[in-house]
């Protein structure tokens, strides 16, 4: 049959061939006609470079098909790619080829998608945008092909606008890495991104596997409000923790962030600011906590609990106590909060007046119990 070969100069050569001819044979015919040595010829059909040992029929090249002839640049050379199975692949490359290009050639030969390929040379992983000459890879150099771990997976990121972004990640990727990928796709700077999974805000230095984020998990992307800020939390040991917060965060949220960083359960944390213990349901803005404010973290003892004390005026006082505290101790705490001397206080629980030397546990007073405070009259003789 006849086929046509078109050169970059626009000249078209007509060749007589058989469908069983190899690409080698075709190159020899071109040499006979045009004097171009086979090793300087690259033949392209349907966007693919044709390999010497294959036949025209392998590529489904039929009568009157047109091949394109490209002359090799001087940097044209062969390199080898060795897989973990021990197989060696031979590639025709230019020293100006990028690692991307090389991965595409491997895909053409072996069917392995580029995003599953890692190429190693001289102990270094090769970056997609760099060229072979950047790494001083010369003719007959051997690269090593490692397939990405199975941890390679897709996850989804849903924005507040309802848009869903698909990301290719590894389970070993850090949250930082994920934010960079989102920046690449969407242009949102990492420091404006908050990623939420299973109700938790994800911390930059942690990995997807730390949060048990698996393939096809969906993260939620929230853009930081302008109220996004850093605050400091100082522990009794003198250690200072830095937290990323919003002024709309509740004290609960802040305790969860401390748990994520330090492993301390929220119910063992007491947070103090400006001499006040902070209540879980309130927000940072409720307490006028601003950027770079310092909170103090005090750990609750095991028996630590909150109880309430209701006065005759209807006011309710919240106290932090231990079940081993005596009634005396409780009266001292009330004095600290309200300025009422202990000898003017009578405490009632379950209809009983409580005696100073007894403990809360003696009266079976448990967390969130409510005591009633009655003030003694001055002339009273109890």
Curated annotation (Swiss-Prot):
Pfam families documented for this protein: ubiquitin
Cross-link (Glycyl lysine isopeptide (Gly-Lys) (interchain with K-? in acceptor proteins)), chain numbering: 76
First-listed, main subcellular location of the protein, grouped into a coarse class: cytoplasm
TM spans (from-to): none
UniProt keyword Membrane present: no
Swiss-Prot/TrEMBL GO biological process terms: meiotic cell cycle; modification-dependent protein catabolic process; nuclear mRNA surveillance of meiosis-specific transcripts; proteasome-mediated ubiquitin-dependent protein catabolic process; protein ubiquitination
Stretches assigned to the Ubiquitin-like domain: 1-76, 77-152, 153-228, 229-304, 305-380
Protein's cellular compartments: Cytoplasm; Nucleus
Example of a GO MF term: ubiquitin protein ligase binding
Propeptide feature: residues: 381-382
Keyword Ribosomal protein among record annotations: no
A GO CC annotation given for this chain: cytoplasm
Cross-link (Glycyl lysine isopeptide (Lys-Gly) (interchain with G-Cter in ubiquitin)): 6, 11, 27, 29, 33, 48, 63
SUPFAM superfamilies documented for this protein: Ubiquitin-like
Domain of life (superkingdom): Eukaryota
Keywords for this protein: Cytoplasm, Isopeptide bond, Nucleus, Repeat, Ubl conjugation
Function: Ubiquitin exists either covalently attached to another protein, or free (unanchored). When covalently bound, it is conjugated to target proteins via an isopeptide bond either as a monomer (monoubiquitin), a polymer linked via different Lys residues of the ubiquitin (polyubiquitin chains) or a linear polymer linked via the initiator Met of the ubiquitin (linear polyubiquitin chains).
Family designation: Belongs to the ubiquitin family.
Extra remark beyond the main annotation: For the sake of clarity sequence features are annotated only for the first chain, and are not repeated for each of the following chains.
Record's protein name: Polyubiquitin
Source organism of this protein record: Schizosaccharomyces pombe (strain 972 / ATCC 24843) (Fission yeast)
């Amino acid at each position: 049959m006849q086929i046509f070969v078109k050169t970059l100069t626009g000249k078209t050569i007509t060749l007589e061939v058989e469908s069983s001819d190899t690409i080698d044979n075709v190159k020899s015919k071109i040499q006979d006609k045009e004097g171009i040595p086979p090793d300087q010829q690259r033949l392209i059909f349907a966007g693919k470079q044709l390999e010497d040992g294959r036949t025209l029929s392998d590529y489904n090249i039929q009568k009157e098909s047109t091949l394109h002839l490209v002359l090799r640049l001087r940097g044209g050379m062969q390199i080898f790619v060795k897989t973990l199975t021990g197989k060696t692949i031979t590639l025709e490359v230019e020293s100006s080829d990028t690692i991307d290009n090389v991965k595409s050639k491997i895909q053409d030969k072996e069917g392995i998608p580029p995003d599953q390929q890692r190429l190693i040379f001289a102990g270094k992983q090769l970056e997609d945008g760099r060229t072979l000459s950047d790494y001083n890879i010369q003719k007959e150099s051997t690269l090593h092909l490692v397939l990405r771990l199975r941890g390679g997976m897709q996850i989804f990121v849903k924005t507040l606008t309802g848009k869903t972004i698909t990301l290719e990640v590894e389970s070993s990727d850090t949250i930082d890495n994920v934010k960079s990928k989102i920046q690449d796709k969407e242009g949102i700077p990492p420091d404006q991104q908050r990623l939420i999974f299973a109700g938790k805000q994800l911390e930059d230095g942690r990995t997807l596997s730390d949060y048990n984020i698996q393939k096809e998990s969906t993260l939620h992307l929230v853009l930081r409000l302008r109220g996004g800020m850093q605050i400091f939390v100082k522990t009794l040991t003198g250690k200072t923790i830095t937290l990323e917060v919003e002024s709309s965060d509740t004290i609960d949220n802040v305790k969860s962030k401390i748990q994520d960083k330090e492993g301390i359960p929220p119910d063992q944390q007491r947070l103090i600011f400006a001499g006040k213990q902070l209540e879980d349901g309130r927000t940072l803005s409720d307490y006028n906590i601003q950027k770079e404010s310092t909170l103090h973290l005090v750990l609750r003892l095991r028996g630590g609990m909150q109880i309430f004390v209701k006065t005759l005026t209807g006011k309710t006082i919240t106290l932090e106590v231990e079940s081993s505290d005596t009634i005396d101790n409780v009266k001292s705490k009330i004095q600290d909060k309200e300025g009422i001397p202990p000898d003017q206080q009578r405490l009632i629980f379950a209809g009983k007046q409580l005696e100073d030397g007894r403990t809360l546990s003696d009266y079976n007073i448990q967390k969130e119990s409510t005591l009633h405070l009655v003030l003694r009259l001055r002339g009273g003789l109890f």
